[in-house]
Every structure is written in structure tokens, then in C-alpha cells.
Regions:
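Acidic helix-start/capping segments at beta-turn-to-alpha-helix junctions
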Residues: 12-28
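Generic hydrophobic, aliphatic-rich segments that mediate packing or membrane embedding
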Residues: 1, 16, 38-42
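Alpha-helical support elements that line or immediately flank enzyme active sites
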Residues: 1-8, 100
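Predominantly the structural core of cysteine protease catalytic domains
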Residues: 24-156, 161-192
Length: 192
């Protein structure tokens, strides 16, 4: 959406997360299982076949095995990522990307504290994982801003708007720039 605003495209819409997820799983041959996805493949999918509006194929996770209707694929061709790039986890590059008006997506390792009631209520995840904390999986999100005073990134989650700060949360700079905690960082620059 941000790249559409930046490009001043006539129609601005929220991309369908489930359309991307299904087509990503198709690339990875994992449609039969809800096993997550690689961001790189999701970006490739949007580059190859585009994405339809969320309103057309809404995020209903129970439909993760269902192929979107043909109309979604026709509409998706109007919105293909034609210029995208991988980013390094260098703080200056990540902040520079955001300062230029481009959000970025990335994956991060989720630890138990991220799913705490406090993070769900406030959206603030202010610390790195503790040594005795267990990893419970990975998650893909979109970074939309940063706060130098607090040393954290502002991130959009794909979960409902009742979670965190109306669907947003924060992670410390040190979390997002750690190659042991975050990876697969991409930005889309042009959609056509």
C-alpha cells in the first residue's frame, strides 16, 4: 500500500495476505500443510502474478488450502511487484529504507515472551529473548517506522486489530538487526 501511495497509483488497496500465502505455498509445494512461508517466495509470487485486494480474498486462515477464484488472479495482474530488493540487517539501511518512504517485510524468530498477555495488550516487546526462553517458531511482518528515542522499530502484524497497538507492535533495533533473530528482509519499490 505504501508503495502505491508513493507512486500515486489511482487505486490504493490492502493486498490480500491469503492470496500471497496460498501462492507462496504453491511455489514451495506446501499447500497441504499450514507450514508457514518464505518471504522471498512471497515476493517472487507477487512479482510473477501480482496480488488482488484483501476485500476480494480476505484473510480467513481456515481457507489456506483453498485456491483463490480465477477473478482474483485476473485482478492480481494489475498489481505486480516489478522492482524489489533484499536488504541487509544494517540499522542504517533499514532506517534509510523507511525514511525514503518504503516499508520492508522480514521474518523473525518468535520466543515465548512475544506471545505474552502484556505484548498482546500493549504491543511493546522491549527486550531480546532471555537465555532460558524457548523459541516457538517464526513469523513474517512489515516494518513501517522507527523511533530513535526509544530505539525500536514500529511493525505491522497480520493479526487482528485488537492485538497490540491496533495490530501494530514494536521490536528493539537490536532484535531486527540480529542475524540470529531476524532474516529475509525485503522491500518492494514499484508496483505496476
Amino acid at each position: 500500500m505504501f508503495d502505491q501511495i508513493k507512486q500515486r497509483l489511482a487505486q490504493i488497496f490492502t493486498p490480500s495476505r491469503l492470496f500471497i500465502y496460498y501462492n507462496n505455498a504453491s511455489l514451495e509445494h506446501t499447500i497441504a500443510s499450514d507450514s508457514g512461508a518464505q518471504i522471498r517466495d512471497g515476493i517472487k509470487s507477487v512479482g510473477k502474478q501480482g496480488d488482488c485486494p484483501e476485500a476480494e480474498w480476505p484473510y480467513v486462515i481456515a481457507k489456506f488450502k483453498t485456491r483463490p477464484p480465477k477473478s482474483c488472479y485476473v485482478d492480481a495482474l494489475k498489481y505486480k511487484a516489478v522492482l524489489y530488493q533484499r536488504l541487509t540487517p544494517a540499522l542504517s539501511q533499514l532506517k534509510g529504507c523507511l525514511a525514503s518512504g518504503y516499508p520492508f517485510v522480514f521474518g523473525f524468530t518468535v520466543y515465548e515472551s512475544f506471545e505474552s498477555p502484556q505484548v498482546a495488550r500493549t504491543g511493546h516487546h522491549a527486550s531480546l529473548p532471555k537465555p532460558d526462553e524457548s523459541s516457538i517458531g517464526g513469523h513474517a511482518v512489515m516494518c513501517v517506522g522507527y523511533d530513535d528515542a526509544k530505539q525500536w522499530f514500529i511493525i505491522r502484524n497480520s493479526w487482528e486489530s485488537k492485538w497490540g497497538m491496533k495490530g501494530y507492535f514494536t521490536l528493539p533495533y537490536a532484535y531486527v538487526t540480529s542475524v540470529n533473530l531476524a532474516s529475509d528482509i525485503w522491500t518492494i519499490r514499484i508496483v505496476e
